[in-house]
Amino acid sequence: IKYISSYGEFKIGLLPMVYNTLKSWGVEDIKITDKRIIPNIEPIIPTQLGANYNPIKLYPRQIQAIKTLLNNKVGDTPFLICAGDYSVGFGKTLLFCALYKAYQGNLPTILLLNDSDLFNQFKREIPELLPNEDIAFIQGSKCNRWGKFNVAMVQSISKNIRQYQQNLLDIRMVLIDEADIIDNKTYQTVISYLYNSFIRIGLSGTIYMNERKNG
């Protein structure tokens, strides 16, 4: 499989692998230059979500998970294209909402799902976790509006990519459920239109399980 083109280009998600490979070859002077225009917003990790009269507090392990994701680096360079592997019951819904809230709701965000049952579950849960936020749910080809926090079925976006491509250009943070299947064609189609995003974080409970299975 050819990961690097004849021009020396590779997909940005492969940067950690390329960096580690160069290090294993004994290359020491590796310089990473990020020329993307990134808003100067310092993340503040919330300790609770929901309404003030009925707050839902994050557990210390959830707060630590968010810190780990938001402090991800390649070498000494911040690199917020990463994935976290968390067991079932860890609270992925809370993590997704907390990641959005960490940037004070200032980053247009899309949460990509591939399961309709989970979509309906999030449709019930997320508004309670993010009251007063501009939330939109996108399924099928009929979508009248996008919000600041968009929960979308990846199949719907992929099938209607021309209809939604302008909306995707506005997205700055991409959150992905079941990150272990991100390399399938449907996800890749959508992600190829999300090139203005500088944060891409996936969560899964099976990443390393699949690696062990394939090993």
What are these regions (language model features)?
Residues 73-101:
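Walker A/P-loop
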Residues 127-166:
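Inter-Walker segment of RecA-like/P-loop motor cores
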Residues 173, 178-215:
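Post-DEXD/H (motif II) to motif III coupling segment of the RecA-like Helicase ATP-binding lobe
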Residues 2-5, 21, 30-83:
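Conserved pre-motif I regulatory segment
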Residues 1-25:
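Accessory, non-ATPase domains that flank or precede helicase/AAA+ motor cores in DNA-metabolism machines
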Residues 107-108, 146-151, 170-173, 196-202:
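Loop/turn-to-beta-strand initiation segments
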Residues 104-105, 109, 116-142:
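Conserved helix-turn-beta segment of the N-terminal RecA-like "Helicase ATP-binding" lobe
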Residues 150-190:
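Conserved RecA-like ASCE ATPase "motif II neighborhood" in helicase/translocase motors
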